[in-house]
A protein has these predicted regions:
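Fe-S-dependent hydro-lyases/dehydratases of central metabolism
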Residues: 1-576
Length: 576
């Protein structure tokens, strides 16, 4: 969705950098990166890091695929090392098989219901059991994709004959290798799920773990249905939707939009007639892109109800703050678009008979190869006027004194910290302009107050920074002078991004101390540099109230060095 020159300039900039630096470039319109990677690049047994939290989509093909901050990925691409703390391993043991109109989306919604959005932090989710072989690669990828909403490091399925058949259909059979757990594998935790017992589910506003059965939520009126995203935009999902819509008409009170996940999916839909069935039914076909999932278009009406096959339903993420967003499967979405109300798709009766092709259309003409080493130096990197320098910081001072510039509660997402949407995303290369939107969902005065103060602390609750891996949620607070974020607990990727930005992440040793601090209190971290380097206890002094609170920090020696150096950029310059 390009309403000005900014996105076009960004695309041109990235394209020129990729060409110069030896990187393949998937051009705009080729599809959502996770869907394209699954189809054309993913290999079982390989490790993948990507600067998007839904990189674990690759776990559906047997990859160790992890979301990370952009700086972490850039350092790894430049020859550095990517570090993670060894996670615990959770075995989700699947038995049985999905019943008609029950989908892979319902599997991960059930896992979210059990584990919650905090339950996967510091864990890898491994799927095992006889039920695994009943799931296709796209279905597995749907499940691993939304493992991000658990806060998990990643999720992974074995690589088996189902994986081999998928790769063969993509013309990549030589990329297959078997991957399975050892017979004597030991897990930290086991969750049992019988696929045969699952029913159509929905996550209610405004959190992916607020899960109920569709039949228990009831027949609420629906204003909008959006089908697509990196979670549910595969050919299999699209064929199911087309079959449900075939010969029918979308309810007059419903706006239905559909975004196939890749050019390959769109091509095949066009050739087999599925696209025509969608259009004839009244669907609005969107570009193969993230689109409405990140708030780029298709915002619901005021106080509207929108069913989406997406992965997140955070407050305001859709672009309409008072809209009610429900996360559902493509089957629930398509049937509800016809009825105009939330509908259990099992009411259709006869099961869908979807035949997947034995081979996919392979056309990689939208993947641009880099220049040869001989020609790389001749490639000019193209900048636009909206592309501004990366914010930097100085080394950590011995002590820090500043106000609690903002106090927020539990489950603050990176969408709260740095919102997305059509109004804001075009400025992601312009941190000074972007900064005016920081925390606007929570407090529209934050950016102005932070600029006026020049420095400050943020006080947060539990699971601070969950959701997207967007490093702008750390870079913009850095630009606004935030020196430390003090919380009950952090989400993994955001905590790493804060460290990379040179912002100190600290936790209350006693969670009750959170309640003792008010926004505007004058706070101090005395001798913080020495304490961090010497692994000493850190105390937060509340100058306003005359109190002290013990704080904790979970930092490796490398992370301490990064913080003290003023962030990963400074650290990398000095050490690589």
């Amino acid at each position: 969705m390009q309403t000005g020159f900014e996105n076009a300039d960004d695309h041109r900039f990235i394209q020129s950098v990729a060409k110069k630096r030896g990187i393949r470039f998937s051009r705009p319109g080729n599809g959502i990166c996770h869907q394209v990677h699954l189809e054309r690049f993913g290999k079982p047994g390989k490790t993948l890091i990507g600067s998007d939290s839904h990189t674990p989509t690759g776990g559906g093909i047997g990859m160790l695929a992890m979301g990370a901050g952009g700086l972490d990925v850039a350092v790894a691409m430049g020859g550095g090392t990517y570090y993670i703390t060894m996670p615990k391993i959770v075995n989700v043991h699947l038995t049985g098989a999905l019943q008609p109109y029950v989908a892979a989306k319902d599997v991960i919604l059930e896992v979210l219901r059990i584990m919650t959005v905090k339950g996967g932090v510091g864990k890898i989710i491994e799927y095992t059991g006889d039920g695994v072989k009943t799931l296709s690669v796209p279905e597995r990828a749907t499940i691993t994709n939304m493992g991000a909403e658990l806060g998990a490091t990643t999720s992974v399925f074995p690589s088996d004959d189902v994986t081999k058949a998928f790769l063969k259909a993509q013309g990549r059979e030589e990329d297959w290798s078997e991957l399975k757990a050892d017979d004597d594998a030991v897990y930290d935790e086991t969750i049992e799920i019988n696929l045969s017992e699952l029913e159509p589910m929905a996550a209610m506003p405004h959190m992916p773990d607020r899960v109920k059965k569709v039949k228990d939520i009831g027949e609420i009126k629906v204003d909008q249905v959006c089908i697509g995203s990196c979670t549910n935009s595969s050919l299999m999902d699209m064929l199911k939707v087309a079959a449900i819509l075939k010969g029918k008409t979308v309810c007059p009170s419903v706006s239905l939009s559909i975004a196939p996940g890749s050019k390959q999916v769109l091509n095949m839909l066009a050739l087999n007639g599925g696209l025509s069935d969608m259009i004839s039914a009244g669907a609005r076909i969107l570009e193969s892109a993230c689109g409405p999932c990140i708030g780029m278009g298709q915002s619901p009406n005021s106080a509207g109800v929108s069913l989406r096959t997406f992965n997140r339903n955070f407050l305001g993420r859709s672009g309409t703050k008072d809209a009610g967003i429900y996360l559902v499967s493509p089957e629930v979405a398509a049937v509800s678009a016809l009825t105009g109300k939330l509908t259990d798709p099992r009411t259709l009766g006869a099961p869908l008979n979807i035949l997947m092709p034995e081979s996919f259309i392979v056309n990689d003409n939208m993947v641009e190869m880099p220049a040869s080493p001989e020609d790389a130096d001749k490639v000019e990197v193209l900048y636009g006027p909206n592309i501004k320098p990366f914010p930097t910081t100085e080394k950590m001072p011995e002590s820090i004194q500043a106000k609690a510039i903002l106090k927020v509660g539990d489950d603050i997402t990176t969408d709260h910290i740095m919102p997305a949407g059509a109004k804001i995303l075009p400025y992601r290369s312009n941190i000074p302009h972007l900064s005016q939107f920081c925390f606007a969902v929570c407090d529209e005065t934050f950016a102005e107050r932070a600029k006026a103060e020049g420095k400050g602390f943020i006080i947060g609750g539990a699971n601070y920074g969950q959701g997207s891996s967007r490093e702008h949620a750390a870079l913009v607070p850095l630009y606004l002078g935030i020196k430390a974020v003090i919380t009950k607990s952090f989400a993994r990727i955001h905590c790493a991004n804060l460290i990379n930005a040179g912002i100190l992440p600290l936790n209350f040793a006693n969670a009750d101390d959170y309640d003792k601090i008010d926004q505007g209190d004058e706070l101090a971290l005395n001798n913080i540099r020495t304490a961090i380097l010497n692994n000493e206890t850190v105390y937060l002094e509340n100058i306003t109230k005359g109190e002290k609170y013990e704080l904790k920090y979970d930092l490796s020696q490398r992370q301490k060095d990064i913080i003290v150096d003023g962030g990963l950029l400074n650290y990398t310059k000095e050490n690589i």
